[in-house]
Amino acid sequence: FSLLQKKKTPSPLFLNGEWGSGKTHSIRLVRALALESGFATMEAVLNARTCPPNYPQRIMPYMARNIAFGEERGIRSVIGSLLRDDKKAGHALATVGDRSQADIAQAASTLRALSSHGETALVGTSTAWRVLTGTDIAHSDYGYRRTKALLRLHWTTAFVRAAGAKGTVLLFDELETIDQLWNRRSRATAYEALGSFLDAPGTWCVFGITERFLRVVRDDARSDLYWQASIDGRRFLKMWRDGNEELIAPPKVADEQALELAAVVERMYRDAYPETGDCGAEVRSAVSDWSRNAARNPRRRPESGGAAEG
């Protein structure tokens, strides 16, 4: 966060954990910390069908829907609140310029003009939102639409920063689904998009992955696909080819920590719903079941390994 705040580009972070290891919870923790620290966040859960990494124009609507900054959620709320401050919006639009994306810059300017004239109803129904959310290009597979989506993302992160955010944290979960793409060419295109995400202005990328992704990307980085990739794709693969990736595992949770966490959650529910009775026994029973269930708990203790193998 400190590097991002200083307008430096941090190395991407890869959270490596299998199902049930707490990988997604760790991504949520990064998101919460980023928002508390004055950063914006955008996120997407990738899959090869509806949110594939080789088609950023399909990813963009998910990221627009999940953008967050301060108390605002969703691009209508985030961008809308920034545009309502005419002075701040004017400064941000002037600072960012069109970023080679005249359509999204024009859409934002249109919404700003409507907002400044008090046309609240027109702001809410304006077709300019389709450009900002990316839904106008989401169903097109043309290569130039891929480029347009990436440039729009770059514009959005630059605008949010110019309007007051310390930067934007891009969160991607389930990156291992890259192995579900049709072929090597599809993966090469995905690496190009990933390399462009890393290049977005004022951003830090955090990816949730499993061993499946590690096997695929390391094989591709050592194969001729590396030389066939675009400049952006090669930049992403070079990180793996040179062994410069930053990998961490989700924190392991021991029984004592699980009990403590469960007790905190119980207290939160009792504070929110005072009529809730004492659930201490149920909490302890749930934690005990969790710790014994090796199939759902890859963080199991070493002594439970025999049961898992059986």
Model-derived features with residue positions:
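Pre-Walker A adenine-sensing motif
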Residues: 1-8
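Residue-level preference for the first positions of well-ordered beta-strands
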Residues: 10-14, 167-169
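P-loop NTPase nucleotide-binding core
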Residues: 12-160, 273-277, 281-310
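The catalytic "switch" region of P-loop NTPases
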Residues: 131-132, 137-280
